């Protein structure tokens, strides 16, 4: 039985059909539609008794060559700020003093509703009982100077940022269809360090190795760029082909043994 979360109400019936022999398999996944609203799935308890995770957005409007998320998750759908703040108040009342705002495309929050991430963080910081706010992964090209200025003015925001890189080679970034260069990435990272204070801020990132067409020189360029950025932590993982993405059919696929070496 394969079903989407939007059809979870029918999962017992679907399983029963298979058990009864009415069906050998059930695939019940409905595609996301443009204009679809954010699906509310609030949580009030977490394994960590002080830190809670609050999802504020789903979907992605980008078309990175390697990524299947837009196809699987649909377009950007922002959760209403009223709903988010209500959940934060419930969490604070339950003893959670730290929240992590998460999303599929966090900087896209509010792009479909006329608001924005910086505004949400400002309002979240005003919730009584919430003492620390952390952010999920951020795309460098979607952080404006005004966003950085406003975020730096929120004392409750922890200055630890996961700034997605994917490659330290501008050539590879173009092939990936990422909308920034390494120079632009470095400029945003520098602005974060300046705004929050070099001694206070920490930046982590992720890097894909073995993307189709990546040469030894591209790899060396990527390594050199990463080394120069003074990241607190780098999550490195090999490129994995995803059927239905443009990169799946790209020429010059890198052999698996090279990716792992």
Features from the language model and the residues they span:
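Proteins enriched for Cys/Gly/acidic motifs involved in redox and nucleic-acid/cofactor modification
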Residues: 1-109, 144-146, 151, 157, ...
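Pocket-edge positions in alpha/beta enzyme catalytic cores
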Residues: 3, 75-76, 112, 177, ...
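Short low-complexity, flexible loop/linker segments enriched in glycine and/or proline
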Residues: 19, 114-116, 249-251
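Conserved SAM/AdoMet-binding glycine-rich loop
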Residues: 93-216
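Short acidic, glycine/proline-rich loop/turn micro-motifs
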Residues: 173-176, 246-250
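Terminal RNA-binding accessory module
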Residues: 249-261
């Amino acid at each position: 039985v394969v079903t989407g979360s939007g059809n979870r109400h029918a999962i017992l019936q679907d399983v029963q059909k298979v058990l009864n022999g009415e069906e050998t398999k059930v695939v019940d996944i409905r595609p996301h539609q443009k204009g679809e609203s954010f699906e509310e799935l609030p949580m009030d308890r977490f394994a960590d008794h002080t830190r809670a995770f609050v999802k504020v957005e789903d979907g992605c409007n980008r078309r990175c060559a390697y990524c299947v998320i837009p196809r699987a998750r649909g377009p950007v759908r922002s959760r209403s700020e009223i709903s988010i703040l209500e959940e934060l108040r419930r969490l604070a009342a339950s003893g959670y003093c730290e929240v992590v705002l998460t999303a599929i495309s966090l900087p896209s929050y509010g792009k479909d509703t006329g608001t924005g991430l910086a505004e949400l963080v400002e309002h979240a910081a005003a919730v009584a009982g919430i003492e620390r706010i952390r952010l999920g992964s951020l795309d460098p090209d979607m952080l404006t100077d005004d966003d950085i200025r406003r975020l730096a003015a929120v004392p409750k925001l922890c200055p630890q940022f996961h700034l997605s890189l994917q490659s330290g080679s501008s050539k590879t970034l173009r092939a990936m269809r990422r909308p920034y260069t390494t120079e632009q990435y470095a400029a945003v990272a520098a602005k974060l360090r300046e705004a929050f204070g070099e001694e206070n801020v920490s930046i982590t990132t992720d890097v894909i190795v073995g993307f189709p067409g990546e040469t030894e020189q591209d790899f060396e360029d990527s390594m050199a760029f990463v080394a120069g950025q003074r990241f607190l932590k780098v999550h490195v993982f090999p490129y994995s082909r995803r059927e239905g993405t443009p990169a799946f059919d790209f020429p010059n696929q890198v052999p698996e043994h090279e990716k792992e070496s």
